[in-house]
Curated annotation (Swiss-Prot):
Protein name, entry field: Ceramide glucosyltransferase
Lumenal side: 1-10, 216-287, 329-348
Pathways involved: Lipid metabolism; sphingolipid metabolism
Domain topic, free-text comment: The D1, D2, D3, (Q/R)XXRW motif is a critical part of the GCS active site, involved in catalysis and UDP-sugar binding.
Top-level EC class: transferase
Biological role: Participates in the initial step of the glucosylceramide-based glycosphingolipid/GSL synthetic pathway at the cytosolic surface of the Golgi. Catalyzes the transfer of glucose from UDP-glucose to ceramide to produce glucosylceramide/GlcCer (such as beta-D-glucosyl-(1<->1')-N-acylsphing-4-enine). Glucosylceramide is the core component of glycosphingolipids/GSLs, amphipathic molecules consisting of a ceramide lipid moiety embedded in the outer leaflet of the membrane, linked to one of hundreds of different externally oriented oligosaccharide structures.
Record topology, Cytoplasmic segments: 33-195, 305-309, 370-394
Active site positions: 236
Family: Belongs to the glycosyltransferase 2 family.
InterPro entries in alphabetical order: Ceramide_glucosylTrfase (IPR025993), Nucleotide-diphossugar_trans (IPR029044)
Membrane topology category: Multi-pass membrane protein
Length: 394
């Protein structure tokens, strides 16, 4: 009995520690969002002396928003940049979209590369290789096809690239769109994701997604260039790690990386979350423990049990109150990331929040069950450490 009592006491202490850690993350991310995101910062260098930037744009297929998203890059207000559009297949409809924009903006330094270069299993790296090899500026901006920008987005990112910074990244968020699936995505990228993303970066953990990353080409070349990351599916994580390992700091842009895909659904969102969870589990095995207990419902149960064991509080009353507080703080976080009025009602938020939180265990168990992922046109079997092998159809 003494051993059991000691174990229960240890679990109760763990629940208390979990409570303080998770609420520290809540407060930290909200304060950072209010102080840093969507703020106009003073220019750290004259406009005319901003460094040149080579934009690498990987393209695969089209969606209803692709041409509008791409056009925002042709309309950037920046003194010196080039756009390197990379398409894998000649018959890809994205080729026609690119040619249309190249004809519409002849004064913009932009080129189209078709065919890619096979250097590994990562299709995004393979697609970008021709553009990377001819990039002429010291800064490389890799930005996904579903991202849209403002005219001053690149200026904001370049101003964050100070002397000791090697990588500038944008917090992923989602543009206002119609439909419940869009609301669900917006709630996730405005609550759970920024809480972990911001907390990790502020406390010194390198957490970067590759949707919009500005990097020093010299540092990437020292790490072996893009080809060195072609063995990984999550190339963004390993690029960031390589830059950090060489002593460079990271900085987060004040503007978010605004996702604006024209194709979205609840099933697509769920599949994307499962794919990301699989990658995290294989790259960082500690995720198996940390991720489930950081979600609202599981954390509330653990902390509620600890409160009952130590203080004899009612578990269900504590669970409901804790979830309500989490729900409210998530809404505050969402409004901060949005930087303005939301495109949906508080009722829509409540429903989307509950469904998103209810999905978490299913997403996590699905990720554990099957180590293979489908991404772009291929299927891959993940290995521990982040590498992968392509599954070829026989």
């Amino acid at each position: 009995m003494a051993v059991l009592d000691l174990a229960l006491q240890g679990l109760a202490i763990f629940g208390c520690v979990l409570f303080f850690v998770l609420w520290f993350m809540h407060f930290l991310s909200i304060v950072y969002t209010r102080l840093h995101l969507n703020k106009k910062v003073s220019d750290k260098q004259p406009y005319s002396k901003l460094p040149g930037v080579s934009l690498l744009k990987p393209l695969k297929g089209v969606d209803p928003n692709l041409i509008n998203n791409l056009e925002t890059f042709f309309e950037l207000d920046y003194p010196k940049f080039e756009i390197l559009l990379c398409v894998q297949d000649l018959d890809d409809p994205a080729v026609d979209v690119c040619k249309k924009l190249l004809g519409k903006y002849p004064s913009v330094d932009a080129k189209l590369f078709i065919g890619g270069k096979k250097v590994g299993i990562n299709p995004k790296i393979n697609n970008l290789m021709p553009g990377y090899e001819v990039a002429k500026y010291d800064l490389i901006w890799i930005c996904d096809s579903g991202i849209k920008v403002k005219p001053d987005t690149l200026t904001d990112m370049a101003n964050q690239m100070t002397e000791k910074v090697g990588l500038v990244h944008g917090l992923p968020y989602v543009a206002d769109r119609q439909g419940f699936a869009a609301t669900l995505e917006q709630v996730y990228f405005g609550t759970s994701h920024p809480r972990s993303y911001i907390s990790a970066n502020v406390t010194g953990f390198k957490c970067v997604t590759g949707m919009s990353c500005l990097m020093r080409k010299e540092v990437l070349d020292q790490a072996g260039g893009l080809i060195a990351f072609a063995q990984y599916i999550a190339e963004d994580y390993f690029m960031a790690k390589a830059i950090a390992d060489r002593g460079w700091k990271f900085s987060m842009a004040t503007q978010v990386a605004m996702q604006n895909s024209g194709c979205y659904s609840i099933s697509q969102f769920q599949s994307r979350m499962i794919r990301w969870a699989k990658l995290r589990i294989n790259m960082l095995p500690a995720t198996i423990i940390c991720e489930p207990i950081s979600e609202c419902f599981v954390a509330s149960l653990i902390i509620g049990w600890a409160a009952h064991h130590i203080f004899r509080w009612d578990i269900m009353v504590f669970f409901m109150c804790h979830c309500l507080a989490w729900f409210i703080f998530d809404y505050i976080q969402l409004r901060g990331v949005q930087g303005g009025p939301l495109n949906f009602s508080k009722l829509d938020y409540a429903v989307a929040w509950f469904i998103r939180e209810s999905m978490t265990i299913y997403i996590f168990l699905s990720a554990l069950w099957d180590p293979t992922i489908s991404w772009r046109t291929g299927r891959y079997r993940l290995r521990c450490g982040g590498t992968a092998e392509e599954i070829l159809d026989v």
